[in-house]
Amino acid sequence: MVLLNKPTPTLNSVPFRAANFSSLIEALDYAAQGDTGANFYSGKGELYAALGYAQLREEAIAIAQRLLGLGLEKGDRVALVAETHPDFLSLFFGCQYAGMVPVALPIVANLSGHSAYVEHLRGLLENCDAKIVASSPDFLTIVEEASRNLDLRFTGDLAKLSAMPVADVELPTIKPDDVAYIQYTSGSTCFPRGVVITQRSVMSNLGGIVRDGLKLRESDRFLSWLPFYHDMGMVGLVLVPMASQTSVDYLETREFVKRPRMWLRLMSETGATISFSPAFGYQLCMSRLRPGQAAEYDLSRWRIAGVGAEMIRPVTLERFSRTLKDSGFNKKAFLSCYGMAEASLAISFAPLDERPRTDWIDIEQIARCGKAMPINNSTPESRVKGFMLCGKPLPEYDVEIRGEQGEVLQERHCGVIYVRGQSVMSGYYNAPDKTAETLSSDGWLDTGDLGYMLDGQLVIIGRKKDLIIINGRNISPQDIEYVAEKQPEIRLGDALAFAVPASDDSETSVLVVEYRETDTEKRTELRERLSMQIRQEIGVDCFVELVPINTLPSTSSGKPSRSKARLQFLERIKDHEEAQGAVA
């Protein structure tokens, strides 16, 4: 691979095309005629690789010929450990030219040690029926362990693959209905599912993002620290830049977590205009900034600061813009959006160049009657909650909010969000029953998300599977978690709420909180205070458990996993009961 020794330019030598291609390889064929590409930075902010789209195309075609030389066929699955590295891009697009289906596998992230990660990888390899698995040298030992005794044609890195013979065959023709890739869900409520996305679906979504969501300009430049195995990182920050012939700069996810201010430094130095993050990324940056440091950065060119992938709290964006005021950051850069892997990526975008809009509602009314009622002067402060508007759906989509009987609901009535459009998945790989549960025969996708419409815009309030149902009331776990996070001792993201079975076959709510204090009196006081405030503000009894720091589980993409937290809690209760029985 021939890498450039300086970043690829922002301005290009070929006319801009807004992702209007029939396939990813057609898009790369066009992007390769220009000068732009992908750039990779170390945790110290130093450029270590620049891969122009022309070089990427050349490398990808060579890889495709070697994949075909292994005896693989069009449609075979190729598992790729998705490290933020140029090798991953070469392998991913090599699969595209070979007509094979790349499957991005997560790198180590919030899993309980080596053995858990190996087991997780093996489960994904078996689930997708991978024919080969490739990774960087750093992950080869783990990959070999995870793939032991599996019927694979190849296990290794790019260097090993490059030494393989070239097939003396023509590259296959890629058609719109061919599978482009399999994207695993984050697994926030269950084991990750392999979402099957066709060339037609992903190209439709890329076009909508480029034309309607971001309204890309020739002067734009992307920067990302999001992992390649996450749909926002892969589709939004790998495929969108390539399909729009736009340069992109990458910082590895783990380096961002260690040095979040490097994100701001690179935004300042590269002149990037577009970057996306879940809300926790903005929160993490704020937590590492000391007074006066904002002026060290020039964020005046940051045109779009996208935010999505998890619930958006208005206070987080307000604090970030206030903290970064001296950097030239404009609050109007914030762009809330909504999407999911099952829809390729994007479903809706808020309007550009407007301040984020918040709908302040009475959460008691949602719990009791399922309607998002605006607050008034008599609404108690404890019942006030703000939800960000996530914009109008992209033009390709039909969107409905449906009630429990499948009826279509009117504005401000809360229900399950259903979408239909060309970007929607073909189904879950090797899971016909789950596909039938989620995708109707006439193309409607049950997102599993709860929300309502307001002035034509989507408002997301949570996940259906996360709902806590107490005495017929639907209670959002985020409302309970918010009570905890208002306490001075508890950081944002250090509390998870869920329901567990009660002895009378009903449900009871549980709040698990990470808390480093060991003093017994302080711990007791915090538990009692939380229980009392939850009872006062939400009207339910809640069992509060305090656990050590770094106990709460997350998905591979960093989202909180309430389902895993629930299972861990039940396991702790079981172990405690067994220990009590042994003592007795």
Predicted regions and their residues:
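AMP-binding/adenylate-forming catalytic core of the ANL superfamily
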Residues: S268, S275, G421, S426-G427, ...
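Conserved pre-ATP/AMP-binding loop-to-beta segment of ANL
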Residues: T36, P165-Y184, C190-F191, S201, ...
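Conserved AMP-binding/adenylate-forming core of the ANL superfamily
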Residues: N39-S90, N110-E119, T173, I197-R200
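Conserved AMP-binding/adenylate-forming
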Residues: R303-A305, I312-C337, A341-Q457, K465-L467
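Conserved AMP-binding/adenylation subdomain of ANL enzymes
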Residues: M203-R221, D231-T273, R288-Q293, L352
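ANL superfamily adenylate-forming
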Residues: G45, A109, G113-H114, V118-L124, ...
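Conserved C-terminal "lid"/linker of ANL adenylate-forming enzymes
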Residues: D494-A499, V510-L511, S531-A584
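N-lobe entry segment of adenylate-forming
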Residues: M1-L51, Q55-L70, K74, A98, ...
